[in-house]
Amino acid sequence: NAWEYVPTGHQVLGVAAIDIDANNPNTMFIGTGEAYGSSENYPGIGPVRTPRGSYGIGILTSTDGGLSWTKSLDWSLNQKKSVQKIQINPLRSESIWAATTDGVYESTDGGDSWSNIHSVTMATDIIINPLDTNMVFVAHGGMGSDGHGIYRTQDGGETFSKANLLVGGGPFEYKGKAVLSMSSEKPNIIYASIGNSDGSLNYE
């Protein structure tokens, strides 16, 4: 019924992502920044980007329920990046995934170090199959991302492939932001809500 401000002790202008370790609720991660925008091509000018929101300083972690915070993924504001989504592997808490403006990052050691495992820009959402955590879906789009679409890995991030086929054949295309949701009872059912310049689209 009531909310309390939680200071982090860091220069945080915005938080777009948070995840709490289901196996240890005192451990949590927040993704800073919430940069998003659009890109339009104008004749004789070229692409013009219109950013919105704020830039971040990476990912912060707390192991004492939010009383204190340390940097996990260390960025600076002048790098102009943000973290859009964080997902902790429900079966292996040391495996953490992050969708960022710089691509997809993964930590395999509980946030001590991070690797960019999928460098397509503007990752906007990420979901992990709770029954098979090697299967992960990532959405990319917006800000002129050169690889907008929904991607899937079935080998824990070793390889990614586009999963943009409509039932009956043919790809669906979009350039706006996409968010994903997975059925808790049937993880093979995934929903995608996609923003386009001509209105939002929803797919299953």
Spans of model-derived segments:
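Extracellular glycan-interacting surfaces
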Residues: 1-204
